[in-house]
Amino acid sequence: HVVDIENLIGPDHRGATVDQIQAVLAEYRELVGAKEDDLFFYGANPGLRVQVMLATGSNQVRGYKGKDGADRALLDVVGSDWVVGQFDRVCVASGDHAFAPLARSLKGEGLHVTVVSRPMSVSAELYTAASEHLVLGEGLAAA
């Protein structure tokens, strides 16, 4: 799981609390059917990293300062060469176009790529690169 937490929370991510992060991640986990032993990498700006670590209990929280810092950090950690051969499915929790080349590469290698975004918040490039697209807030409404 490649989780751009800022993208999942939305425009008000700067003031996100541990409870808010846990709530959006619980919805994400249910939506994609995440298992307890799944591998997660989280991306967040340096100002949000501590809250994400507390919310997840994970030290796999990456982020750089500056524009698209969380995206760039996640892409540096999760390259297609490392993923191919170890996994058969990758979930990208973001709508950002920056993840489209990774999704396209993984899908081209035969992996199932699930993209999860907020409603109306996925780039066309990432949408077409994915095997499937799930939307937070819509998948659980019918449950």
Could you describe each region identified by the protein language model?
Residues H1-A73, K107, H112, M120:
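Domain-level signal for Mg2+-assisted phosphodiester chemistry and nucleotide/NA-binding surfaces
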Residues D4, V78, V92, D96, ...:
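A residue-level signal for conserved active-site and pocket-lining positions in enzyme catalytic cores
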Residues F41-G43, R89-G95, L102, V116:
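Acidic beta-strand-to-loop metal/phosphate-binding motif
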Residues L48-V50, F99-L102, S123-A124:
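Short, well-ordered alpha-helical microsegments
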Residues L74-S80:
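Acidic, metal-associated active-site segment
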Residues V77, P101-L106:
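A short acidic, amphipathic alpha-helical/loop segment
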Residues V83-D88:
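Glycine-rich phosphate-binding loop signature in dinucleotide/nucleotide-binding domains
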